[in-house]
A protein has these predicted regions:
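Class I S-adenosyl-L-methionine
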Residues: 52, 92, 110-113, 129-139, 151-335, ...
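A short, Lys/Arg-rich alpha-helix, primarily the initiator
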Residues: 1-15
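Residue-level detection of the helix-turn-helix DNA-binding "recognition helix"
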Residues: 27, 38-41
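C-terminal target-recognition/interaction regions appended to catalytic cores
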Residues: 19-22, 44, 295-409
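DNA major-groove recognition helix of helix-turn-helix/homeodomain DNA-binding modules
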Residues: 43-62
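Short alpha-helical DNA-recognition segment
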Residues: 16-34
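Core alpha/beta nucleotide-donor-binding catalytic domains of modification enzymes
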Residues: 61-186, 196-200, 205
């Protein structure tokens, strides 16, 4: 059990960490560490608690490396347009094993591989992957981008009385690659995730082609539902989920027990400033200053940016437009976190009192807002992290979908 003496704790921790590493984690400089060690000043009670947490994490015995017999998974799945693995997380929790991953963005690959150190490599551009090289699997997962389908070629075939299939209608879009892999590998089921507007995109033509492709061309029984992430996290985030089974099942989205919306509030995911914020060693002190018990000052908007956002909002309001920054309080539910959050953070700004400018969420808070646990590692820059979480899924929504899908296989 770790000592309660902060100096003794400091000695124990320093056997494993340099002054610089420890200073980064605690949000102090190396001179302060030296002064503690030399007895010139004593660590504050808050720092003492942080040191105790660190010492406890170091004291945990490392598990012996024993060759374990691999447990047979309940099902296998592939992860297309994988992002940082939000959908995968949910299906692994149901006993599934990921046997193939595709994600084109190299920075997202870094985050994904850090959190899912697989034996299989991450494939890049799905358009360059031969369907025959994709392993057989039970479930295909894909959060594919929303793109319009050209109807020029289809209209011509209709006029000539020729048959046309999904390859004609969807060629040149990323949905085509989803369809061709389903066609070639014939999984038992699939789950596709997209923005709510997929249904109305291109005057409904986009969704019509997708439904026709999945049902008529590929022979799947599909159901779909728009679900708001606000049932599970303090964020309005409406996304459509399309589930298909090769065999007819009694799958029904009504089996998902949706908690009332807006019960979760932003205060739950914000860094705690009362001394209870956990020390996350893998965050390396990048987001939160445990010494000062607050997020680093870099997340607070500059006077110039805050003035600009207020003036810009006033200008649009006067013109009758809807633009405005989203100022949130601890009891608020936020707007949708987008991939552009890195630009100015305007859609979700945390109120810090009348005498201080608001601040952006930190990347760790964004992870929490999307339903990722604090164990999730963020190995990329803030800019990349904001984009990745803004493009991700609410893990809890996927978790509930996976829970009712798995038994139907």
């Amino acid at each position: 059990m770790p000592s309660n003496d902060p100096i003794q704790l400091l000695k124990e921790i320093r056997q494993h960490k340099t002054q610089k590493e420890l200073a980064t984690i605690l949000g102090v400089d190396t001179k302060t560490i030296s002064r503690w060690e030399n007895g010139h000043i004593a660590p504050s009670p808050v720092v003492g608690l942080a040191l105790k947490d660190l010492a406890a994490s170091q004291a945990k015995p490392k598990a012996k490396t024993v060759a374990k017999k691999k447990t047979k998974p309940k099902f296998t799945f592939i992860d297309l347009f994988a992002g940082i693995g939000g959908i995968r997380t949910a299906f692994e929790e149901q006993g599934g094993e990921c046997v193939f991953t595709s994600e084109w963005d190299s920075y997202a690959q870094t985050t994904y591989s850090t959190n899912f150190p697989d034996s299989h490599a991450i494939n890049g551009d799905i358009t360059e992957v031969d369907a025959e090289d994709v392993p057989k699997h039970d479930i295909l997962l894909a959060g594919f981008p929303c793109q319009p389908f050209s109807i020029a070629g289809v209209s011509k075939k209709n006029a000539l009385g020729r048959a046309h299939g999904f390859a004609d209608e969807t060629q040149g879009t990323l949905f085509f690659d989803v369809a061709r892999i389903i066609h070639e590998r014939n999984p038992k089921a699939f789950l596709l995730e997209n923005v709510k507007n997929l249904v109305s995109h291109d005057k409904g033509r986009t969704f019509d082609v997708i439904k026709r492709t999945l049902e008529t061309e590929l022979g799947y029984h599909i159901k779909y539902r728009v679900i708001d992430g606000a049932h599970f996290v303090p964020q309005h985030r409406e996304r459509i989920i399309i589930v298909g089974f090769k065999k007819k099942t009694d799958f029904d989205f009504d089996e998902i027990e949706l908690p009332p919306k807006n019960q979760r509030v932003i205060g739950e995911i914000l860094h705690k400033t009362d001394g209870s914020e956990p020390v996350l060693e893998h965050d390396e002190g990048k987001y939160f200053d445990h010494g000062k018990k607050k997020p680093h000052d870099k997340y607070t908007l500059t006077d110039g940016l805050w003035t600009y956002l207020q003036n810009y909002a006033a200008k649009h309001k006067a013109a009758g437009n809807g633009f405005g920054f989203g100022l949130v309080h601890p009891e608020s539910v936020s707007r949708t976190l987008s991939a552009r959050y890195y630009k100015d953070g305007s859609e979700i700004l945390v109120y810090q009192g009348k005498k201080k400018n608001p601040r952006r969420l930190t990347p760790r808070e964004c992870a929490r807002l999307m339903g990722f646990s604090d164990d999730f590692k963020i190995p990329v820059s803030d800019t990349r992290a904001y984009k990745q979480f803004g493009n991700s899924v609410v893990v809890d929504v996927m978790r509930h979908a996976a829970k009712i899908m798995a038994p139907k296989l």
